[in-house]
Structures are given as structure tokens and as C-alpha cells.
């Protein structure tokens, strides 16, 4: 069947079978003589056949460029002379086919089949020849599997190469078509529109990532201009390995910021003008004469030491004077007596004052109603007189004078009414003021709550109960979310055995038992008695008994502030005047005991020590040790007489060098003796009193 198609740049089938094969790039294009295409009668093109021919031509080109290909060299002109794909393959004999087969299998196993050599491997094309050659032999499935695997890899690499080339071509076509569309749009836009030509817009390209480091970094010349030359000079002379180059110690500090400055940045201190002192003048001191006369009175500086004479001092008289002073001081009214009774001005208040211990008790609740503390609530109440309590307000000195006490005492700088507000040194803050009670507060009586009663005989107006109010009648969202199924439903019961909690997972037979504190603590304490402070060891080493107030490990109960408690027993109270009020008991100090121990490692040549000890035991002369010829004689010598270890140690002090003799100790010498006893077959025998060791030769 013949058809007529326009021939404008299309492919034309060769007229004769002997004509040479031309690739699409080198095939000549017909030149049309007229603008109208000419229709010719010719047979239809076989597109599939042309596609195969193009593939084979590319295979041959890659084969010629690959040096590892087993194919023979064929010129492109000779390779394009055939019409069928089989005629384009190189003619190989059986030996070359087997070599080519082994090469393909080797490349497949080493995974070295790439796009460069995939088109030069003809394992797929010679598959039929290989099967014909193997027909006579038994079928080897291992060889067949390897052949199929290598063929699949070769074909896959070829497909990937063709796919990549096609995408390259498509990318180039897209760019060219876009460029042609832009030129066409510009031609259409540049038409005659009022005789004006639109300016061409340029697209600005922005780079989000800068790849040139020179545009980011500053040049070296710009950096050098900002560096202080004085700093460069100081840094060049700085040596980190010497004390002369300590750089920071030479810097100056300015102002309170403690900022270090170089010499060029240091600001000089501002100096103020010196003020001239006023000129001396005379003044009238007649008014000050009376004051000077009072200061010149001959009064003793210390009345208690007025009769003291440095060269005539008597210890007995001094002790009598001190005892008289102590008795006089004890009888004085200014002495603080802890056993004194409470003054009459203090009267127990009707209601206890809330202190820091009752801070957690709610309002309206009496602390005495809580458990067993109700019995002892009297000891925790503060005694004060509310009626006579005078509040300190803003005023002048006359107002403050009213607060002073009429009777002087050690702690009576203020009146007892003012001191009642003071809770002790532990509670240094004053209590807040209490509001003055009015008549309305006293007359206020708590009304009893009316009991709710329901009368079924009365006529009830339901409109009053069911009227609309401003209050919300629906539940809020938070209430609805809290009352969900999860909060009102118990968790699933897994029937877990609680006994497994006390068992170990890896050792189920072992059970964990909980030991109580009483079992583990009370048992050893029962056997321990009270400590005897009068034992000879403590009395000989001076262990003074401290007062109860100096002990921080008191096991007694907490009694609270002393000013707030009542009903204390006299057993827990102490007499502060046992040592005198102004005396302080010195703390117990541990005696410093010097312990001699080796603070540095001692260096000892053990070989030299062994040789010297053996020569001393064998009674060899000292000059014989240094002679190399007599070494064997020294080793072969034996101990003839019994010797004592103490005498051997003293003899080593003379034979060893001074440094080794100083570092030699009895343990080192005895360790060396044990080594010699093992090597020389010596016998060591101790004395009855364990004072020394006898050394003798064992038979």
C-alpha cells in the first residue's frame, strides 16, 4: 500500500539495500524547490525498525570508545553498512564468546556495571549462541541464574541511561520553547500603541545563600586598621611560659566597673585645688572652765583594782576580794534571776493570744480542742494584761517617757506593759495592733439558725419558687467536663494478685519483707548502757562537763519560749551564775598529736640491698663486692654462724650509700631478708620474747 505524505525535513528510506546506513544527524535533508510541499508515492516507514537501528548504532559507538570491550575494532563506516541488527554485531568465535561471558559475570558479581560499559556488554545479544553451545551438556541452573541476573543488571543500567538522556533533551526543549514564547509576547506587545514603546522589565534575581566568602568576611587591611598598635606591641612581647610576660598584671583598672584599660586608654585622675586652712585665732574659754574641772577630778579608773599593787600582789587576798564581789553582785537588784516569780502586773488574759505555733489553726477554732493538746493548753498561753496595754504611737519624747519603767532592772528599760508585746529574741517582730472594741461588738449576739420545717397544710405560692432569676440554671462547661464517664467509673479490674508486689520478678520465691524501725534500732540500744563521764580515760585527758545550755543534742521535749510557758519544773532549769555571769566556758579542744609517717616516696635499689645483705650474712669483705670476678664466689657462699636480724640491719647502714641508708627501714630490710631466705635456703627463727629474729643456714 502506497501513501503520499509531505516530505519536509522527514526521514527517507534508503532506495537500495546496498546503500550505507546514515544516522539521523548525518543524513542529508532534501531541499524543497517551492513553498508548496510535493506529494510523492513511497512505501510507509517502519518506525520500529529505525528505532532498533539507532540503538544498535549507539551500541557500536560506545563499544569503540570502551577499551575493556572484547569486541574487535570496527570502523563506523563499516558498522553502518548493514540493515539488520544482527548484522551490526561483531562476529565472535566460541572462545571470544566464552571470554565475553566470563567478563560479564565477573562485572555483575563485583557490581561494576555502569552506564559507560553497559552498552558494550553483549550478553543479551549472544544469549542464543550460549544456549546452543550448552545444549549438549546438562542444564546448570546456577549458570542460568547468574546469566539472567547479569542480563537484568545490564538491561536496567541501559534503561536508566536512556531515561537520563531523554530528560536532558526534554529540559533543553522546555527552555527553548519558553524563550520563543517570550520573544513572541514581546513582539505582540511592541505593536503601535499611541506611538509609545513599553520599556522592557528586568527580573531581579535574589540570592538567599551567599556562596562567596569574600563578600561576607572583611579584608585583612580593614581589620588591621581597628587594632590598637600598642596592643600589638604588648602581645608580641607576651610569653606564656615566663613570668616576665604576665600581661594582665600590667593593665590598669579605671572606675568602679573594674574594666581593664591599655596604657593609651587610661585617664589621669582629676586633682582638686588644695584648700587653704583657716588662720589660727584665739577664743574665750571661760565658759568651758567648769567642764574641764569636772574632767580633772582624781577618780580611780577601775574601783575594783584600785588597791592592786604590781609588786605586792597576794593570791589569797585577791580570791577574797573576788568572792566578796560575787556575793555583792548576787545580792544586787539588777541581777537577772531565772527562778524569780512573775510580777504581779501580769494577769492571765481571758483569751489566748495567737502566736507562731497556732498559725495553721482556723479562725473560730480553739487550739485546746485538738486531741491530746487540750490538757497542756495552759502552758502555751501568753500572760498579758490587756487592760493596761499601752500602744506605742507617734509622739514626742514626753510620750516615750511614759513608757519607761519606774523600777530599774537589767531588762527594765521599758515598762512591763510595753515588754508584754515582746515575745523574745526568736520573735523580733511586734504583734499587730488590736482594734478597740466598741459597744456594738459587745452587744452583738450570734443568732441561732432557724430549723427548716416543711408544712404540707399551708398554701404554697409556686410562682415565687419557679420565677426566672438572674442566676444561671444550667450547669457550666467545666462542671459537665468534670462529671464524665471516666471520673464516675471505676478502672477495669485486672484481677491482679497483690501478693506479687512483694515478690521479685526474676526470683518469685523470694519475698521482700518490711522491717520496722523498732526492730532495727531498739535491739542494739538495749545492750548499751549510760556513758560514764568519770572514767579514767576522760578524766586524765581533761574532758570538762559542759552546762546543759551549751549542748545542742538535748533529747528533752521542746518547751517553747521561756516567757510564754508556765508550770515548768525546777529540774530543767539551770543556774547561770555557776561560772559567773560574765565568764565564758572555753570549748573543748582536741590535742594535736604528731604522727610520723612517710610524706614522700622512698627510692631503694633492691638488688643492691640484697647483695649487701647477703655479703654481710656470708661475712664477705666490702672490697670484694665491687669486684666482678668474685660475684660467683659470693653467690656460692654459705652462712656459717647464726646472726641476729637487728645486727644485720645496723651493719647495712654502714655498707649502703648515704641516701639508701637514710631511706632504709626495718620493713624493707625484713622483706629483703625473706627474699634471700627463699633463694639461699635460709632458716628464720624467732626469739621467745619476740624481740628479734635469728638467721641461720638450713640443711
Swiss-Prot record:
The keyword Nucleus applies. Keywords: Cell cycle, Cell division, Chromosome, Cytoplasm, DNA condensation, Mitosis, Nucleus, Phosphoprotein. Residues 1-35, 176-203 are annotated as: Disordered. InterPro entries: Condensin_barren_su2 (IPR022816). One of its GO terms (cellular component) is cytosol. One of its GO terms (molecular function) is chromatin binding. It comes from the Eukaryota. This is Condensin complex subunit 2.
